[in-house]
Amino acid sequence: MRSRLAVLLCLVSAIPATSVDRKQNWTHLVRIGGNSLRMDRVDQIVRVATETNVFGIEVDNDIPGRYDSFLDPAEKLKAIKAVAAKAHAVKNFAFVYIAGLECITANADKTTHSFMKDHPDWVQRKITGEPAVFGGGSAFWISKGDEDVWISPYAPEWRRIYMERVRQIAATGIDGVYVDIPYWMTHFEGWENTWASFDDYTVEAFRRETKLDARKDIKLGDFKDPGFRRWVDFRIATLTAFMREIDANVKSVNRNCMTIAEIYPGIEEEAVRVGADVYEMYGVVDAIAHEYNLASGGGTAAAKTPLDWWGHLAGIQSFRSFAQGKPTWMLTYSWDGEKGVDLRDAMANMFMAQVMAGANLWDARGHVMSGSNDLPTRTRTFGWIKDHAQTFYAPRNPIAPVGVYFSPRTRNYFAEEFIDSYKGTLALLMQSHIEFQVVTPATLQSFAGPVLILPEVKCLSPEEIESIRSYAAVGRALVATGETGRYDERGETRGANPIHQLLGLKRSDLKVTGTTGTKFIYDPECPGRAYWHLLTEEFDSRAATGNAAGSRFDEFRNRHVSELMQVSSFSPAVEVSASPFVAALIARVEGKPSVFLANFKGLRSKEIATQLPEQNIKISFQGKPGSRIRILPFLGKVRDLKPDYTSGKVVCVIPELDKGAVVWVE
């Protein structure tokens, strides 16, 4: 192997988890359609993309993921070069799919040579020694008679050949290399709890890094064990370093070629199990395509409940924060045969929610990457987004947000407790139409909003503690819940909790508020988690009828927002009055305070995909006489709203909102 883990970790740590501000490029504006690539399909691919307003053409002939072309890529390289040239001729861009750590040998049951037959030592393994090799039916993309293997990223000769193939692909002139499934094998049946891989190469790399034998010295699956936590960190760092090396090889031959990772785990526990953490990976690639379906709830758009949509938005807003100016692509699925739902409505809901959240769209058929459920719907929607691209994809800057802290280490070691608290906190703010910003270790020091919420942030480093101390010292308010601060960044229990010391707490079992000196709320019961649990019990049935009055979640939400405002003396810069079934995402876009609205009222999983209209939404901006308020409804045209001026504010009312809209003042 050309580089050892210690070197790889140094390379990763030298790159910040977030990128510096950069000029936008084609990856920020994509409207994606996918295609299977053969030389005889090149003209058709580019023609259909042009006709349906696709910008950013995905093509798939997977050189390293098919054993024959892994060995001899010549013919497939010609097709990649041809489609790149055709795309450029019509002022479009193309990127090509390659597998990360998976390789399929076609008809392996009838051939002398296959990946596994030739290189059994390159394959990932369970701790029992069982290899990660599968046959037809293990996944929908594996045909009968085929052999599917999952490879150790530490297999030196495989990695050498793989990076050579990456350079050859980038040298064709293609605009992007799109890497799918850079995963440890933990997502097929029977492998979910393996915490693979325990192949010789990986075990030796871990031993060099930690002096621990992964087969003997760790308690597999036990997060109380320091050795297992090091194994968790090692697995994440390994895949991040793998993607960084791919990007370095891409750029070494084509500096304008982008590296994109496709990742299905989002903010939840799956990221830890699979080892592909988008928080870390955004720092080493140019974009991430999130196949964020089941993790965010519901699977397809047609199957999502109203609460699933809020989980989806929580994920996307987290991704947008992790990206730090890089684009967020959403490879999610709209409709896969749900008979009770019109596929066009399902597509519209997915496109609306994601564009309002600032993510780039990918239109696909069913649950595959290519095709479309309805080309006319794609054409119309993509054309509308093309006409309003700056409205949705210009940088969104904060105005006066409440911060919600995402702690990668807490998620890694205490996923269940943290994620419920985190998502519940985001949902409470979104459903109260309060501007928020996801804050991370990379952005904590620069965060200047009036309130910072630490939702069950169990693990904090000394550097994070010091940044929080500095934040509170200038009069800003803190909200600390649950066991925030109990553990250090390695997951070790502290003798004394520095957050409790900062807040001057005498006891940790009582709720305390402070309005003099340090302004804070300390709540050991964690309201974010409590709110999320209330939502799971009540929200969908209430959303179906559009009536939140008298619900426990609505009473809880109003009470906690009032308490937050009182302790922090916080007054929103933009005020939105609407039901909790409407999301309001607030930001400054090209200097204009803007509100991106998404309505989920009336939706029912697999039954109803047309919303109940939200009526008489009131929005108040800071402004003066002469200010102009404009609205762009989803798939509609820009028009003016009647403004009212009062006490330094300009106010408008939206009589009716069907799906979504963006409103701004200028």
Feature map (PLM): residue ranges:
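Bacterial N-terminal signal peptides
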Residues: 6-14
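Polysaccharide-binding and catalytic clefts of secreted carbohydrate-active enzymes
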Residues: 128-313, 318
